[in-house]
Regions:
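Mid-chain, well-packed structural core segment of small domains
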Residues: 73-93
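Conserved acidic
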Residues: 5, 9, 82, 123
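Small/polar-rich, solvent-exposed N-terminal microdomains that initiate assembly or binding
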Residues: 1-60, 97-102
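Short beta-turn/strand-loop junction motif enriched in small, turn-promoting residues
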Residues: 53-56, 75, 117
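Acidic-leaning, charged glycine-interspersed low-complexity segments
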Residues: 91-139
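Oligomerization/assembly interface segments of phage tail-like spikes and tubes
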Residues: 62-78, 125-135
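Short, solvent-exposed beta-strand/turn "edge" segments of beta-rich domains on protein surfaces
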Residues: 57-63, 119-124
């Protein structure tokens, strides 16, 4: 069975982030497709958040517009400085990136927006970056 467009995009996004040396310099190998259980969380880390897929019918074929988020989590002494650096590295790695998807082709991947906030615990900072990608079936 062939992978669906959302899964193919997930695999490509995680691979791109893991290959990024700027991001790796801050988080090392802690780039996940889902968040680690809280008892095992080793800050800082990055993970895929939401993944919303919408079919877009164009003539006789269908593309998928996929909205997805990447979440950056940190507990630095310096406050939001580290989470902003992580967010910037994620944005640079994915905005207009030439991602290679198995069984599909990427029309585009664009950064949309980001939100940064401090958790109620007063120690954890989170940045959530939103992207949109258009994925078509490989021809």
């Amino acid at each position: 069975m062939a992978d669906g467009p959302a899964y193919a995009l997930q695999v490509a996004v995680i691979a791109r982030l893991r290959a990024d040396t700027d991001l790796g310099a801050v988080v090392g190998p802690k780039i996940f497709d889902e968040p680690p259980p809280s008892q095992y969380a080793d800050y800082p880390f990055v993970h895929l958040g939401r993944l919303d897929d919408e079919a877009v019918r164009i003539g006789c074929h269908t593309d998928d517009d996929i909205l997805f988020t990447i979440e950056c989590h940190t507990r630095p002494v310096a406050g939001r400085v580290e989470v902003l650096a992580l967010a910037h590295a994620v944005r640079r790695a994915l905005d207009d990136a030439p991602l290679t998807l198995s069984g599909h082709s990427l029309d585009w991947c664009d950064f949309l927006t980001q939100s940064v906030n401090q958790s109620r615990d007063g120690a954890t900072w989170t940045a959530v970056l939103a992207f949109e990608a258009s994925v078509a079936a490989a021809v």
